[in-house]
C-alpha cells in the first residue's frame, strides 16, 4: 500500500523525530515545494503531544488542515487526529500496526518508501490569465468545447451564508449564450435541486453532490444507486454533528441528500481543529469519506466518485462525437475541482478561479481567472467567439 502527499492539498509534512530514514522523502517534498518540520513524540501526555504538533505546524507556517503528520507513535497519531490535521500516516517501526489505526491513523505503512509525492503542478500565481489567452493561436483556442462550471466561488462569490449565494451579475445570461453554442454543465457540491434552482437555466446539465445526482438537458434524472444506500447513515451523522458542534458559534452543519457539510467560515480560528477532528471522527465511525473545501469539511458516501468522474461520465453521454470529439473545459476554484482538472486530460483545459484562502497552493489548472465576475466575462466572450465560427 502507498499513500500520496499532494501539494494541492498539503502545504507541509511534520515528521516524528523517532522515524528512520526520512532524508529521501524530505528531498522529494522540498522539490515539490512542500514544507517540512519535525516534532518529538513520547512523554508529556495528550495535551503536550497536541502542543508539539501545533507548534511544529506554526514553525513551517501551515495550518493543521493542510498538514500531514507522519509518526510511529500511537499517542501522536491520536493527538494529530484530535487537532484536525489533514492526513495522519502511521509508520509501523515496532510491530504495533493495529494500535495506529485504532488511535486514528488514516493509513499505516511499513516504511517511508511507500510515500509518494505528487509533482508537476504549478502554483496559482504562476498561471496565465484565461481571458488574455482566449482566442490567441498560442493561447486558448477550442473550436468544439464542452464547458463545465463549479458554482460556489466560480459562478457565485463565496459568501458567509451559503443560502445567500447567487450567480454573479451577467453569469446566467452568459451561460445561456454559451449553451446555444456548445454543451454546458454545472457541477456543484450543493444538492441537485439547490444548484439547479439557483442557476435556473433550462437545457443544460446539472450535477449535484459532486456528481452523485444529475439531470440531463432533457430533464432525465440519474443518480448513483450505491451512494443512495448511504442516505440514512448521512442523516444520522448530520444529527450527531449538530449535537456535537451546535454549541460552537459560527458553525453550520448542512445536511444534503448525499452529504453532510460542516461550514466553519464564521467560527473562531482556534476552534477549527476541534471542528475538523469531530467531523473526521464521525466519518471514521460511520464509514463515510471525508473531504475538504474552502472553510468546509464534508462527509460523503465512501465511493470512488468525484467531479472528475462525473465530467467523464457526462462527456461519454453527449451526442455522437466520432467526427470531431468535444474538448472539455472546466472552471473551478476549490480543492474538489482538482479532480475535474485532472479529468479533462492533456487535450482539455482546466481554469482555476483564484483566491487566497489556501495561500498560493499548487493546482493542476493551466489557466486562471481572478474572480467569478471574470468567469462571467470569459463565458460571454467564449460564446461570442464560438458563434462567429458558426
Swiss-Prot record:
CDD domains in alphabetical order: HAD_TPP
Gene Ontology biological process: trehalose biosynthetic process
Residue numbers annotated as active site: 150 (nucleophile)
Top-level taxon of origin: Bacteria
Binding residue positions for Mg(2+): 150, 152, 333
InterPro entries associated with the record: HAD-like_sf, HAD-SF_hydro_IIB, HAD_sf, OTSB-like, Trehalose_PPase
Catalyzed reaction equations: alpha,alpha-trehalose 6-phosphate + H2O = alpha,alpha-trehalose + phosphate
Chain residues that bind substrate: 150-152
Pathway: Glycan biosynthesis; trehalose biosynthesis
Record Pfam families: Trehalose_PPase
Enzyme Commission numbers on file: 3.1.3.12
Keywords associated with the record: Hydrolase, Magnesium, Metal-binding
Stored Gene3D superfamilies: HAD superfamily/HAD-like, Trehalose-6-phosphate phosphatase related protein, domain 2
EC main group: hydrolase
Example of a GO MF term: trehalose-phosphatase activity
Cofactor(s) recorded in Swiss-Prot or TrEMBL: Mg(2+)
Family under the similarity heading: Belongs to the trehalose phosphatase family.
Known role: Removes the phosphate from trehalose 6-phosphate to produce free trehalose.
The protein's name: Trehalose-phosphate phosphatase
Organism, scientific name: Mycobacterium marinum (strain ATCC BAA-535 / M)
Lineage: Bacteria, Bacillati, Actinomycetota, Actinomycetes, Mycobacteriales
Name of encoding gene: otsB
